[in-house]
From Swiss-Prot:
Belongs to the retinoblastoma protein (RB) family. This is Retinoblastoma-related protein. The lineage of its organism: Eukaryota, Viridiplantae, Streptophyta, Embryophyta, Tracheophyta. It holds the Pfam family RB_A. It comes from Vitis vinifera (Grape). Residues 726-856 are annotated as: Domain B. Residues 406-604 are annotated as: Domain A. InterPro entries: Cyclin-like_sf (IPR036915), RB_A (IPR002720), RB_B (IPR002719), RB_fam (IPR028309), RB_N (IPR024599). GO terms for cellular component: nucleus. Disulfide bonds: none annotated.
Length: 1007
């Protein structure tokens, strides 16, 4: 924060301070201690309110930014003061406030708050560190709270749909099944009771941030309680005639088995959760339980009573109101002094507080317009097209087959894969895997087993992450949960490791895999990948990626080396989990591998020695990987919320020394394209990978173990090339692929020429190869956006940065902080006398850093400087530290796309079939080519059928052809040609709803 800090005038500053005081004193009625803390943070950060970079928060209006700023300050103070001695002395005072109260006073909604919070964190982070200590970000738990909100939004809708399926609100069947909430805002007391009981279950039986699968099991147990106790006059079903209830012998319908069948949950887990739910009812509501088999109630008619507990007066009209009040008070006490979300908001009808639009949480999102993915640039072998049938087990079969999958049902499906495919496997290496382990120079079986136990214990500790104090049943349940997740990850690890060893032995024609099986980093990457899939399946809020990297001691670059192999060698992996791994690799490529502490830099300084000075000056090298003994000692010494091993959090501070840290990536055996999705459980739209011509695909792939060899070791498959050089070249080719997808999306959205696309693509490649340091500590999209504007300026195009940013906002991968917060090291820039490091807006970065470095390259590509087609090899630059290294990827024209989708169903006729759902259509089809397509159930014109649309489309494509009433498959002239389909199938990113906020309100930069 060494940049210029413009401060408002004394008069303006006094007015802002007065409004903040009013906000705290009258709006939230803060006590003196909390107000003093809030005022201190306000005074420390007040100068930031007047900076131009903050004007883009919210709608860009100063008053709007001010309200956000006030809310951020109060949220930070509330969260970070928890657990302090001063706060503990206050106890459960009456001045407690939570996030919802802050937002009501500031007139903001939850979605917008979490969207803008990252900007505050980036700007005020150093101040928060000074005031609250280095662990402030962990204690703030902003990402966890956001993911928790997303999960609860999904769960509340799931619960509402389920409630409407079984109950009415008026004692008779509902005529309108769209909402539990009536026009007057009334919510059924039974519906409210169920949600409050669910919240009590989360507070007393689950940990604070429980995973989605466990919470879904909890909701199913709540449904069982409601079915057993809500008066039958409110049922919208009958036990004997409801087709989705399975029967069990002569005793009647097995309620829990039926509900588990409907909602794809584990019956064993739901029965255990049911016990916890009954205990909450006994402990909090003081109701007396009795065995259902010993009770006589009309509610129990035709239900098998075995194993069920019944509470005589639980939902009697006389006691329901009292029970709701007790649950309300219990929840109030639980959240009083925690600045968390008041989870009752989901049944209070406060839509204005909830907000609308897209908000991601882990691998999930809530969105009106589903977030699409940029294709992941991984030269991985295609396993199956996502257009092909899903091979994972239990995909919404039976009665569910006609239901559109929801985030919850999809999560339960992947959980079923773990339960049915992975859980039955042995928890130790199989005989085949042991054969490989014992065939090494020394038997490594015991080492592999010990490492798996230590690493997975670090990822899934017996005490929940971040818990201040967990006692009783919640602690026991977390311990059991962690043990189950460890076993699932371990079994998956052994299974995939065996498959990899088998494949590697075939490549090497030998069973001795000592180099691979004794490599510590390889095994940790495999364990991290296995654990991440388990965490992604259960949607664990407290272990959002990249938490597994921190706890295993590996870096993003390390993990990127095993993802594609992991996918390829686990054929049963559900499609959603494949997409999750692919989305992680995209995140690694776009920014994480460029962050400080990435082991990529350890390979880069070997492959390109001229960059070592800059890498060392910025302190970018990875720290040595912590030893297994260090991790084991930390586990034994840990108790609850202790932070991870210190070295896992300080990878950026010192260079790595282990030879295997700088592990180069192996060449893949197949460079075909793969369809992937980013948001695993939101039915995202699938884009395709680009096939690049600059990869040396004709060379045989080296064995997997060479990927983890020392960077300085010669690569036996590439004469005269070190493993580091091979790895960096492959890594760069993947970056270029990802950039090609994103460049193409922006060109389509901006409606630019194909020549402009070629030029931007060429410039990006040249920057990557000749000005590599521009990527350090930055996001590749920041470079892409600058490439667009730089070429537009030099080509004298009428394209402003404002237009570029406005259209970039509509791209699926857009996050506001990408163009609002770009890393700058002024000491290396030597501009304007500035020193130090800070984050600036993208226009400042463009003017001060990008243009001085890239201007010569722009001149080469711009008018009069040649075109991409004339430049097959990047010219060497004398005395340039970023000069292209030997044998780096050559500059290539923009890649052509493989003919993958729609699928050609006839070799004789030009007929293509694409089983698109309507939710996926928009992003696959560009604005310019949308009129060529018709999707079942949608029309290109009002009040027309798809069959008429097909005729209309063919008429437009063949204007000289006579009108036909139906498609004639014998007449090629009447059908869409191959060339037209190929031309139309450039990767498009669709029309995603623009994120809130205005474009940058800054002057256009000058070159």
């Amino acid at each position: 924060m060494d940049g210029v800090k413009p401060v408002a005038s004394a008069e303006q500053g006094g007015a802002v301070e007065a409004r903040f005081t009013e906000f705290c004193k009258n709006g939230l009625q803060l006590d003196e201690s909390t107000f003093a803390q809030a005022m201190k943070l306000f005074e420390e950060s007040n100068h930031l309110l007047s900076t131009t970079s903050l004007s883009a928060i919210g709608n860009g209006v100063p008053e709007d930014s001010e309200r956000y700023w006030f809310a951020f300050i109060l949220y930070s103070v509330k969260r970070l003061s928890e657990g302090t001695a001063e706060n503990v002395q206050q106890g459960n005072d009456e001045n407690g406030f939570n996030l919802c109260q802050i937002l009501r006073v500031s007139k903001l909604n939850i979605v917008d708050f979490f969207k803008e919070l990252p900007q505050f964190i980036v700007k005020v982070g150093p101040i928060l560190g000074n005031l609250y200590g280095p662990d402030w970000e962990k204690r703030l738990e902003a990402k966890e709270l956001q993911a928790n909100f997303v999960h609860l939004s999904i769960l509340s809708k799931y619960y509402k749909r389920a409630y409407l399926e079984f109950f009415s609100t008026s004692g008779s069947n509902l005529d309108k099944q769209s909402s539990v909430i009536s026009a007057s805002g009334y919510v059924s007391d039974y519906h409210r009771f169920g949600w409050l009981l669910f919240l009590a279950l989360r507070v007393h039986a689950f940990s604070r941030f429980k995973d989605l699968v466990t919470c879904t099991n909890g909701l199913v147990s709540i449904l069982a309680i409601l079915i057993l106790h809500v008066p039958i006059s409110f049922r919208s079903f009958t036990i004997n005639n409801y087709p989705r209830f399975v029967k069990k012998g002569n005793k009647g319908m097995d309620l829990l088995a039926s509900l588990c069948d409907i909602y794809e949950t584990s019956e064993d887990e739901v029965r255990k959760t049911m016990e916890q739910t009954n205990k909450v009812i006994v402990d909090i509501l003081k109701k007396k339980p009795c065995l259902a088999s010993e009770c006589k109630s009309e509610n129990l008619a035709s239900i098998d009573p075995d194993g069920l507990v019944y509470f005589e007066d639980l939902m009697d009209e006389s006691s329901l109101s009292s029970s709701i009040n007790i649950l309300e008070k219990d929840y109030d006490a639980a959240i009083r002094n925690k600045g968390e979300l008041d989870e009752r908001v989901f049944i209070n009808g406060e839509d204005s507080l909830l907000g609308s639009g897209s908000l991601s949480g882990g691998a999930m999102s809530i969105s009106g317009a589903k977030r699409k993915i940029d294709s992941l640039a991984s030269p991985a072998k295609t396993i199956t097209s996502p257009l092909s049938p899903n091979r994972s087990p239990g995909i919404l079969g039976g009665a569910n087959s006609k239901m559109a999958p929801t985030p919850v049902t999809t999560a339960m499906t992947t959980a079923k894969w773990l339960r049915t495919v992975i859980s039955p496997l042995p928890s130790k290496p199989s005989a085949e895997l042991e054969r490989f382990l014992t065939s090494c120079d020394k038997d490594v079986t015991s080492d592999v087993i010990r490492r798996a136990n230590v690493i997975l214990e670090a990822i899934f500790p017996s005490i929940a992450f971040g818990e201040r104090c967990v006692t009783g049943s919640a602690s026991l349940m977390d311990s059991i949960w962690a043990q189950q997740r460890r076993m699932e990850a371990m079994k998956l690890y052994y299974r995939v490791l065996e498959a990899m060893c088998t494949a590697e032995a075939q490549v090497l024609h030998a069973n001795n895999l000592t180099s691979l099986l004794t490599n510590e980093r390889f095994h940790r990457c495999m364990l991290a990948c296995s654990a991440e899939l388990v965490l992604a399946t259960h949607k664990t809020v407290t272990m959002l990626f990249p938490a597994v990297l921190e706890r295993t001691g590996i870096t993003a670059f390390d993990l990127s080396k095993v993802i594609e192999s992991f996918i390829r060698h686990e054929e049963s992996l559900p499609r959603e989990l494949r997409r999750h791994l692919n989305s992680l690799e995209e995140r690694l490529l776009e920014s994480m591998v460029w962050e400080k502490g990435s082991s990529m830099y350890n390979s880069l300084i070997v492959a390109r020695a001229a960059l070592s000075a800059e890498v060392n000056r910025l302190g970018l090298l990875a720290e040595p990987m912590p030893s297994l003994d260090a991790i084991s000692m930390h586990i034994n010494a840990s108790c609850g919320g202790l932070p991870p091993v210190p070295s896992l959090q300080k990878r950026e501070s010192s260079p790595g020394q282990n030879g295997d840290i700088r592990s180069p990536k192996r060449v893949c055996p197949d460079y075909r394209s793969v369809l992937v999705e980013r948001n695993s459980f939101t039915s995202p739209v699938k884009d395709r990978f680009l096939a690049l011509n600059n990869l040396k695909s004709k060379l045989p792939p080296p064995p997997l173990q060479s990927a983890f060899a020392s960077p300085t070791r010669p690569n036996p498959g590439r004469e005269g090339e070190t493993c580091a050089e091979t790895g960096i070249n492959i890594f760069f080719s993947k970056i270029i692929k990802l950039a090609a997808v994103r460049i193409n999306g922006m060109v389509e959205r901006l409606q630019l020429s194909q020549q402009m696309r070629e030029n931007v693509y060429c410039l990006f490649q040249q920057i990557l190869n000749r000005r590599t340091s521009l990527f350090f500590n930055r996001h590749i999209d920041q470079i892409i956006l600058c490439c667009f504007y730089g070429l537009a300026k030099i080509s004298q195009m009428n394209l402003t940065f404002r237009e570029i940013i406005h259209n970039y906002r509509k791209q699926p991968q857009c996050k506001p902080q990408i163009f609002r917060s770009v890393f700058v090291d002024w000491s290396s820039a030597r501009r304007n006398g500035k020193t130090g490091k800070e984050h600036v807006d993208i226009i400042t970065f463009y003017n001060e850093i990008f243009i001085p470095a890239v201007k010569p390259l722009l001149m080469e590509i711009g008018p009069g400087g040649g075109t991409t087609t004339k430049t097959n090899r990047v010219p060497e630059v004398n005395n340039n530290n970023d000069a292209q290294c030997p044998e780096s990827p050559k500059i290539s024209p923009f890649p052509s796309l493989p003919d993958m989708s729609p699928k050609k169903v006839s070799a004789a006729h030009n007929v293509y079939v694409s089983p698109l759902r309507s939710s996926k259509m928009d992003a696959l089809i560009s604005h310019s080519s949308k009129s060529y397509y018709a999707c079942v159930g949608e029309s290109t014109h009002a009040y027309q059928s798809p069959s008429k649309d097909l005729t209309a489309i063919n008429n437009r494509l063949n204007s000289t052809r006579k009108l036909r009433g139906a498609l004639n498959f014998d007449d090629v002239e009447g059908l869409v040609s191959d060339s037209l389909v190929a031309k139309s199938l450039y990767l498009q990113n669709g029309s995603c709803a623009s994120s809130s906020g205005a474009p940058l309100k800054l002057e256009q930069p000058d070159t």
